[in-house]
Amino acid sequence: MLRFSDLDKKGAKKQVDTDDSFVEDLSQKSSIKLDPKDWYRRACRFMMNVLEKVRNREKPNLTEGEALIEEIVQASLRGNLPQELLIMAQYGNATRSFLVNKAVNVTIFAIFMGKTLELPKERLAELGLAALLHDVGKVRVPEEILLKEAALKDDELAVLRKYPHDSFEILQGLGDKYHYLAECALHVNERMDGSGFPQGLEGDAINPYARIIAVLELYEAMTHNRPQRHKLSHFEAVKEIIKTKKSAFQRELLKAFLNTFGIFPLHCLVKLNSGAIGRVIQTHEEQPLRPKIEIIVDAQNKRVKIPRTIDLREQQVLYIADALTEENLNA
C-alpha cells in the first residue's frame, strides 16, 4: 500500500539537488516547450487505442502513454507547463468519446495539482499515468447504461459500480510494475469518510493517488456535459465540492485543489454587478475575488466590438455577481 507519507516533498527536493545529471538534463531542455494542442491530440489518440484494446479483451501497451506523461512532467519541472493546456482541459468540449477526453483532462489537472503539492518527479509521473488510466474499466460498462440520459435504476447503478474491479483486473494484468495503477483505479471512487465504493474504505486505507484523482475526477465531471446533465461553471462546481463533499476528501487536497485552480480561473466567464459579462484574463493571488477581466458583453447586454479590460482591484464599486458557462452566454 502506497501511503501519502511516501510522496515526500523534502526528499524530492534533496533528490533534485544532488542528482547532477537530472539538473543538467533540465537545463539543456529548458528552452523546449510543450505544444498543448499537439500533446492533447496525441494523448486522446493513445487513450482511444487503449480503450479499443480493453474493449476487445486485449492487453494495452503503455509505452506511448508513459512517454506522454514524461513530456508533461518534464514541462512542469522546467516551469514552462503551458497554461493553455489547463484551459483546454477545463473549457474544451469532448471531441471524441467522453471517456477519452475525461481521462486526458483529469491527467492534465493531476499534473498541475501535483505541481502545487510539490511532488517529486517519479511520483508526479506515477500520478499522471494513474490519472490517465483510472477509468479504463468503464469501457466495459454497457453503453445503454453509460450513456443513459435518465437517472439510473438501482440494478443499472449496481452494474456501473462494478467497473473499478474491471479496471483493477485490466491494470493488474499488465504486471507487478503497474500494481500501483491497479490499486489506484480500484480506490478512486472511495471517500475519506467511507461513503464511497466499491469497498467503503476510509482515510489512509485509500491509495494516495486515488485520493488526489477523486477530487479532480469529480471536478471534471461537474464542469463538462454528460448524458444525464449539463455542466456547471467552475465556480458552481468548486462551491458544490467544498459545501457538500468536504468530508469525502482530504482537507490538504481540497486546499491544494483551490490553490491550483483558484476561485475564478483564467478564461472563465463572469457577470459583474453592473450586468456586464467578461472573461478572466489575469488572476491576483492576494485578491482572488478581484481578477482582471476582458469585457465582452456590456451592461446593456450588447456584444462589444472592441473588448476593454477592467482590473477589479482598481474598481472597488464593481464585483463579480455570478459565474457563467458558454451555454449561459449563448442563451
Segment roles from a protein language model:
Residues 12, 150-151, 157, 197, ...:
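Short capping/connector residues at structural and topological boundaries
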Residues 20-161, 168, 172-175:
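Acidic/His-rich, divalent-metal-binding segments that scaffold phosphate/diphosphate chemistry
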Residues 61, 65, 72, 87-91, ...:
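Residue-level signal for alpha-helical context at structural boundaries
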Residues 89-93, 147-155, 185, 205-209, ...:
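Short alpha-helical linear motifs
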Residues 106, 126-140, 158-169, 173-254, ...:
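Alpha-helical scaffolding flanking metal-ion-dependent phosphate/phosphodiester catalytic sites
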Residues 150-151, 210, 233, 295:
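Residue-level signature of transmembrane alpha-helix interfaces in integral membrane proteins
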